[in-house]
Amino acid sequence: MAMTWIVFSLWPLTVFMGHIGGHSLFSCEPITLRMCQDLPYNTTFMPNLLNHYDQQTAALAMEPFHPMVNLDCSRDFRPFLCALYAPICMEYGRVTLPCRRLCQRAYSECSKLMEMFGVPWPEDMECSRFPDCDEPYPRLVDLNLAGEPTEGAPVAVQRDYGFWCPRELKIDPDLGYSFLHVRDCSPPCPNMYFRREELSFARYFIGLISIICLSATLFTFLTFLIDVTRFRYPERPIIFYAVCYMMVSLIFFIGFLLEDRVACNASIPAQYKASTVTQGSHNKACTMLFMILYFFTMAGSVWWVILTITWFLAAVPKWGSEAIEKKALLFHASAWGIPGTLTIILLAMNKIEGDNISGVCFVGLYDVDALRYFVLAPLCLYVVVGVSLLLAGIISLNRVRIEIPLEKENQDKLVKFMIRIGVFSILYLVPLLVVIGCYFYEQAYRGIWETTWIQERCREYHIPCPYQVTQMSRPDLILFLMKYLMALIVGIPSVFWVGSKKTCFEWASFFHGRRKKEIVNESRQVLQEPDFAQSLLRDPNTPIIRKSRGTSTQGTSTHASSTQLAMVDDQRSKAGSIHSKVSSYHGSLHRSRDGRYTPCSYRGMEERLPHGSMSRLTDHSRHSSSHRLNEQSRHSSIRDLSNNPMTHITHGTSMNRVIEEDGTSA
């Protein structure tokens, strides 16, 4: 029977120990609780059976019961309370619980008085939790064990109790905070790892980098606004990519200005509340900073993946600019929808955390699971998909360069474009990979950093100290500075893509109050030059009919060049004006299925001519020019064209046109 009593007495402690799973020192200590003085025993142990890690905390928890004890509602009430809040200390590993009959007598005699004072009977004190017996507390055998410890019994024994939230870091239960897997607790502010001077330096460093990134991305976006038709697919995603990181850098700059006013809760000295990290969505300013920062961080990465997709479509299946642009709605749905969904999920899970280094709010700063699933996993997925598509596109372009003969000019432009893609991708991938590496390092060593912090602050906070600490380490500030630097600098490569002489000319024209009409793009538009595939697949000995681009920067006109057709015409002795009209007329010839060439209708010419040029044509000029063309010159030109070798006239996409630069190209 005695053995059964001991086993049953130890069972609640076993459950309690398995629940808290942490660290501290087990030792007998004198009872300092005023309510538990003058009892048959005078030593207790902490933490007690109600999860109070010191007698000061236990005394605060016992205060509501003082009126009942002072009014002496029951002679069993005070021994019963002390059995739970300050149990008798015996040999290590042995705990005695009060009997159920003792609990029932105390409850029946004091419950009405407790209702009068508005004090509920705690759930931890339910009588059904205690062994079914009827003996006083403590028993005589317990007093003997407490007064005569066994030989060799340890005076102080280490026991694993886990992290106990200090009173200064306690948070209202309604807010749903959590710190080190302890509910209603929050990390301290300022940062738990760094000194104030280190935090001040880090804040100014982040502010400076955010200004640089904001300036670069804003310049890219404004360059796009000056000439919105200049950047078409496949390079249009660079603009949205720049906009995303412009917003990211703006939020970090706002965090620099706010310091820790949003990322941290203010201290309340009257309630012994220290400044703690903001968590959850109750702080509207912190929630807004988190939504913008996380949304545009993820959206920027998705836009980079879309950029690699558009390059892949242009390089491998030879999609043209118009064909890629038809998928723009799908691109926007993915780029804004995926980050939006992740942001909503995090808001619903209440995973927002204040960053007391940068002053912003983000996710995964203290919650390792949120860091893994909502930061590391998406970023790694974006890198894998983007790099795969990028390599496939570069390999395809390189195969074209090696296997198919190109003119030297086109070879140089293709190589230049491949170099630009490679440099831009490296400038994006290297910072992003460094950020991912910092996150992996942080989540791997965070447990050691937290244990070190508890070891250094446990006596100050009066909480259990760590047990059997084998490794102690503090994070280096350079790790966090590198993470913030690379997270911001990843948006700067966009300015190198738009940086060119043409950009300088456009800004100069903008500041002087005039706009150039439209200038032909240079090497970065190589994927959009006319009849690229045709030049790759044609016979090297076959002559090419060059095609006029008009004023378009994308080279989408399908008119035959008047200069080339004039070279074919045998009427070179005609006057300059007649020669020009003949060439213009031949530029509108179309070849029918039987091999003959027929003139286009004027309606077809009107549809092909640029809109600005069409307004200058009058009916008189059109009819007068056609009237001066004699029949001999027309038939002679048609005959000469028929006798020439096969001439390729195609209506290719921006990937399937010849790369030819006119003499007037910018």
From Swiss-Prot:
**What keywords would UniProt list here?**
Cell membrane, Developmental protein, Disulfide bond, G-protein coupled receptor, Glycoprotein, Membrane, Neurogenesis, Receptor, Signal, Transducer, Transmembrane, Transmembrane helix, Ubl conjugation, Wnt signaling pathway
Q: Which gene encodes it?
A: FZD3
What is the name of the protein in this document? Frizzled-3
Its family remark reads: Belongs to the G-protein coupled receptor Fz/Smo family.
Q: Where are the transmembrane segments?
A: 206-226, 238-258, 289-309, 329-349, 375-395, 421-441, 478-498
Keyword DNA repair appears in the UniProt entry: no
Q: Which organism is it from?
A: Homo sapiens (Human)
Q: Name one GO biological process term.
A: establishment of planar polarity
Give the bilayer topology. Answer: Multi-pass membrane protein
Gene3D superfamilies named among the record's database cross-references: Frizzled cysteine-rich domain (1.10.2000.10), Rhodopsin 7-helix transmembrane proteins (1.20.1070.10)
GO MF terms on file? Answer: G protein-coupled receptor activity; PDZ domain binding; Wnt receptor activity; Wnt-protein binding
Task: Please give the tissue specificity annotation from the record for this chain.
Answer: Widely expressed. Relatively high expression in the CNS, including regions of the limbic system, in kidney, pancreas, skeletal muscle, uterus and testis.
